């Protein structure tokens, strides 16, 4: 699929479906297949010696899973709870069913950009592999952890789970609300009724709550003939990404984001699930006169990608920066972000994790 076509489809996903309505029969088939897949895999799911908490979503695209995982690992560590992380490792050079546990020699090409970023920011044990069950088993053979956090994997039902945290992009929410390929959803929104937490990344509470109320009305109508199955989606918890500085990829020098004009002319580059969010972060400094360049999520950057930006500073995401380290120059800067979680949520999350851990001891 060409980049232009992919962008055109994505625009329809987050507006009115338009011509994509022609694919509605495929969306119905996708929903049916998803139902049977979930039912089949759940019956044969694998449990482990420690609890598993899924951190995922029901929509395609960036919802902030990586900064969320990082924040949760730190929050658990402050409570004396050791977490390990398993991830798919998109873009990693892994053979089928191969699992790799990250170490100091890991590179983005070996293990994927997101797992490497999690490892660098937290220092926790991270195992990557397309088979998350095998990843958990490998992790537990070599490391003692109290709980495993799965970066994504909500639809990987072979992986037994004790708790689930669903992430929602507070600006895009559920897009047009339709399943693939008409919309961006991997599962029907009523799936959110079975998760433990609904964490909203950014956006306004008014906008998100309005969408959630509409969702509840749709779910209630669909399940009106099955009153015993009527559940409510968990109350949303709102979190915000915070960016305060830039870091030079070659030297480690830091610069406050509010002083970004000191870079002179610069371009912004992003190869993430939702590049617009990153560009808006930079625009929040009041600077708007810079060019933006979007690449597909998990894009494998090379030095050739940056030759067109001679004589300009290059500002990128931290996720992209871990892939550019081998050819870093003084012109390259990245913006680390931290997810600021409400203290009430952190307390509840850690308490629920501790409660489940007790059941395994």
UniProtKB/Swiss-Prot annotation:
GO biological process: lipid A biosynthetic process; lipopolysaccharide core region biosynthetic process
Catalysed transformations (reactions): a lipid A disaccharide + ATP = a lipid IVA + ADP + H(+)
EC numbers: 2.7.1.130
Protein's pathway: Glycolipid biosynthesis; lipid IV(A) biosynthesis; lipid IV(A) from (3R)-3-hydroxytetradecanoyl-[acyl-carrier-protein] and UDP-N-acetyl-alpha-D-glucosamine: step 6/6
Coiled-coil regions listed in the entry: none
Binding sites annotated in the UniProt record for ATP: 59-66
One GO CC term, this protein: plasma membrane
InterPro entries per the UniProt record, alphabetical: LpxK, P-loop_NTPase
Domain of life: Bacteria
Family per record: Belongs to the LpxK family.
PANTHER family: TETRAACYLDISACCHARIDE 4'-KINASE, TETRAACYLDISACCHARIDE 4'-KINASE, MITOCHONDRIAL-RELATED
Protein name: Tetraacyldisaccharide 4'-kinase
